[in-house]
C-alpha cells in the first residue's frame, strides 16, 4: 500500500552517531544534520508522531574505549554522554525548521534535558512535539540499538526505522561482496540465526518478543523516511513471520 496518506501514526527513528559525520572525520557535519532535520520535519508535518533515539559514535564509542583497555562501564557512560551532545544538536536543527522538540535523557542532567519519563514523552508526542531520547538506557553494556527497540515498544510506535549507510539488510557485507543478496523482507528469527549484523542480538530479540516491526533503510538517499511512512517499499522489513527469499 502506498499513497500520500501515512500508514504509520507513530514512529521511532534510530540514528547512529556516525550518520551525523557526513564528510567529517569527527563530530557533526552541519549540512547532514540540517538534511535530517528537514526530512524529519516533513514527516512530522504530515501528522506523524516522531520519537528519535540517537547514538554517539561520531564522538565516542564505549566498545572502542573498552577495547583500548578502558573499564567497559566507564567507557559506556562516556558514550552515553556523547549521545546527549548529538541530541542537543539535533534538537537545535529541528527547532530551526520550526519543529517543537524535547530531549529526554536516561542520565539526569536537568540543565540541558528532561529526565526520561515515559508518560511525559507520550504526552509530548500527543501535543505535536518530537522527542529525542538521549543517554541510551542509562546503563552500561546496552547499545543504542537496544535502546531504540526498548523505547519503540514503550512509546507504542508502529515501526522502528533503523537508518544506515546501505539500502537494507544483506546476506554478507555489500562493500566486500558487490553481488551480496539483499533481503526485501526477513524474520527476526532469520536475522538471529544468520547472525546478520544490522542490530545487536539483544535489540532484535526484544523486538521479536514484542513483534516490533523494523525497517532498515539508507539514510543517505533523500526522501526515504517520507517514502517509508507513506508505505513505499524501501529497504528491508524485519517482522515476525519467516519469509522465503
Swiss-Prot record:
Keyword list, A-Z: ATP-binding, Cytoplasm, Kinase, Nucleotide-binding, Pyrimidine biosynthesis, Transferase
Record text on subunit structure and interactions: Homohexamer.
Cellular localization per UniProt: Cytoplasm
Source organism (scientific name): Syntrophobacter fumaroxidans (strain DSM 10017 / MPOB)
EC code: 2.7.4.22
Domain of life: Bacteria
Record pathway: Pyrimidine metabolism; CTP biosynthesis via de novo pathway; UDP from UMP (UMPK route): step 1/1
Signal sequence, start to end: none
Entry binding sites for ATP: 14-17, 57, 61, 164, 170, 173
Protein's name according to its UniProt entry: Uridylate kinase
Disulfide bridge map: none
A UniProt-annotated Pfam family: AA_kinase
GO cellular component, one term: cytoplasm
CDD domains: AAK_UMPK-PyrH-Ec
Family: Belongs to the UMP kinase family.
GO terms for biological process, alphabetical: 'de novo' CTP biosynthetic process; UDP biosynthetic process
Any GO molecular function: UMP kinase activity
Amino acid at each position: 500500500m502506498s499513497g500520500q496518506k501515512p500508514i504509520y501514526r507513530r514512529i521511532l527513528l534510530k540514528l547512529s552517531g556516525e550518520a551525523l559525520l557526513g564528510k567529517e572525520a569527527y563530530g557533526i557535519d552541519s549540512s547532514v544534520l540540517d538534511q535530517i532535520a528537514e526530512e524529519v520535519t516533513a514527516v512530522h508535518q504530515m501528522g506523524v508522531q516522531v520519537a528519535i533515539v540517537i547514538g554517539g559514535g561520531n564522538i565516542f564509542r564505549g566498545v572502542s574505549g573498552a577495547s583500548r583497555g578502558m573499564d567497559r562501564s566507564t567507557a559506556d557512560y562516556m558514550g552515553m554522554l556523547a549521545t546527549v551532545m548529538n541530541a542537543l544538536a539535533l534538537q537545535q536543527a529541528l527547532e530551526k525548521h520550526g519543529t517543537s522538540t524535547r530531549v529526554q535523557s536516561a542520565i539526569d542532567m536537568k540543565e540541558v534535558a528532561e529526565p526520561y519519563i515515559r508518560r511525559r514523552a507520550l504526552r509530548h508526542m500527543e501535543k505535536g512535539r518530537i522527542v529525542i531520547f538521549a543517554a541510551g538506557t542509562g546503563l552500561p553494556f546496552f547499545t543504542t540499538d537496544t535502546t531504540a527497540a526498548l523505547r519503540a515498544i514503550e512509546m507504542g510506535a508502529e515501526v522502528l526505522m533503523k537508518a544506515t549507510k546501505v539500502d537494507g539488510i544483506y546476506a554478507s557485507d555489500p562493500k566486500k561482496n558487490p553481488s551480496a543478496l539483499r533481503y526485501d523482507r526477513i524474520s527476526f528469527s532469520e536475522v538471529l540465526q544468520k547472525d546478520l549484523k544490522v542490530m545487536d542480538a539483544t535489540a532484535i530479540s526484544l523486538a521479536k518478543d514484542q513483534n516490533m516491526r523494523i525497517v532498515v533503510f539508507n539514510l543517505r538517499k533523500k526522501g526515504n523516511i517520507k517514502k517509508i511512512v507513506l508505505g513505499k517499499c524501501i529497504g528491508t522489513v524485519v517482522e515476525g513471520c519467516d519469509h522465503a527469499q
